[in-house]
Amino acid sequence: MVKGMTHVTKGRSFLGAPLFPLGLFELSLLVFQFLIGMYLNLFVNIPAAISFSRMMSLSVSYDGFGFVMFHMMLGMLIAFVSLGMLVMSFFNGHSPTTVISLALFLSVLLGGINGLLFLFGGQNNINSYFMSIGFILSIIFDMLLIMFVNVGQDIHHNR
């Protein structure tokens, strides 16, 4: 089982080591993002038509604006972390981690872009659906990356 994975570390140090803690950090951010998103869904009434130019005036007029902004900023942090993981895995030179990291980044983008479209596009249910699909795929690909990199680290330490 582990024998086929030895090519990860053959001839060079294992550069995927920072991916493991970053993957755990990203997973914790995704869980926190889910909790904030559920709070917004259940307890905050977002005005039906929000234009980007009107957003700053909403900070005074509606109670949940701070939560919405925090949710958006956390989403941007998640996107930056997943982009960093993609760059690290690319420079690692190991194709499977690069493919998983790319899938993770694209799923984060799917969720984030549809979140923005949901907020600024009249709260269309299809955007909410694709936002949730992006979130679920992000969790799946992040866990796959964590497991894959962890197996590679175990091989490196057992050599």
Task: Show where each model-derived region lies.
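Polytopic transmembrane helical bundles with strong interfacial aromatic enrichment
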Residues: 2-159
